[in-house]
């Protein structure tokens, strides 16, 4: 009897040890990632990251890389304890000092860390062809811009029109910046080629707000279920991905007489009739219901929201 009790005790001890070992292995293989996610979430300072969106989406950034990021306005807002959801965050070009998995080091007056989801890396060696729409910055000034390629004689340094610059009906208007900076050359390694139908940084989106209106925005980053965007007055916001639609970049689907929604101030709720389409320049002449004619970029008019 005593031998049986001793044998049962040995077996129980062995099973307990095996169970503990199994739990340790599970922790090593699975729970560590959960713990890391919980730790990362716990480390998020709501004042420095008020958006319900990951601080990184797996960006492949490198030390010294040329990027677009709101590295000046973000730091000023943090230092002044401003509400980042109400602050305009203009994306400028700069170079990373040190790339990280969640945040990367940039410099504005001093080195500091910026969450990677607010950083758009620009690859080296990109080439473009006529009609391509690119993400770049205004190279006669500053600030994120989309541009359409007019001349691809040198695919690494194309000549472009800036689609985010205003075009007037009167070509001689002093505010006709699109005409003033037409056929501008881009520096090599300074742009990203955008693709229709892809949820990639720089594309135009329309996201339905709580009032049922379609807010216009530029996509910064996307996950499977959320988008981080740059909206009206350069404010960063988050929407459910299911509430957003990509705005087509190809104007070939537009023709005179088409009824479209056009960007007015901050939304796509104004209705227009297409008068003329300039596919080469990515511009559309439209008239609203009050009889006023305007020139809009191909990113500012659409039929996909009907």
Model-based region annotation:
Residues 1-2:
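N-terminal secretory signal peptides that target proteins for export/translocation
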Residues 5-13:
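Sec-dependent N-terminal signal peptides
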Residues 21-44:
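Short, low-complexity, disordered segments immediately C-terminal to signal peptides
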Residues 41-306:
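Eukaryotic chromatin- and chromosome-associated nuclear factors
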């Amino acid at each position: 009897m005593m031998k049986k009790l001793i044998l049962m005790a040995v077996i129980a001890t062995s099973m307990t040890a095996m169970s503990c070992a199994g739990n340790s292995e599970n922790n090593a293989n699975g729970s560590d990632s959960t713990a890391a996610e919980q730790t990362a979430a716990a480390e998020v300072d709501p004042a420095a990251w008020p958006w319900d969106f990951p601080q990184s989406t797996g960006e492949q950034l490198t030390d010294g890389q040329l990027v677009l990021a709101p590295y000046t306005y973000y730091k000023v807002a943090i230092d002044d304890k401003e509400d980042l959801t109400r602050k305009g965050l203009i994306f400028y070009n700069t170079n990373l000092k040190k790339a990280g998995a969640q945040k990367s080091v940039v410099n504005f007056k001093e080195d500091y860390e910026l969450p990677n989801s607010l950083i758009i890396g620009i690859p080296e060696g990109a080439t473009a062809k006529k009609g391509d729409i690119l993400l770049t910055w205004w190279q006669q000034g500053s600030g994120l811009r989309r541009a359409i390629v007019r001349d691809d004689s040198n695919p690494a340094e194309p000549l472009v029109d800036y689609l985010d610059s205003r075009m007037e009906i009167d070509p001689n208007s002093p505010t006709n910046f699109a005409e003033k900076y037409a056929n501008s050359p881009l520096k090599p390694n300074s742009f990203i080629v955008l693709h229709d139908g892809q949820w990639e940084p720089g594309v135009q989106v329309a996201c339905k707000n709580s009032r049922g209106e379609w807010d216009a925005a530029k996509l910064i980053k996307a996950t499977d279920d959320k988008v981080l965007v740059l909206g009206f007055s350069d404010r960063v916001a988050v929407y459910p991905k299911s509430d957003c639609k990509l705005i087509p970049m190809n104007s070939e689907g537009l023709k005179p007489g088409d009824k479209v929604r056009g960007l007015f101030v901050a939304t796509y709720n104004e209705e227009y009739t297409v008068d003329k389409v300039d596919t080469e320049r990515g511009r559309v002449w439209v008239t609203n219901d009050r009889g006023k004619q305007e020139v809009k970029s191909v990113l500012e008019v659409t039929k996909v929201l009907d």
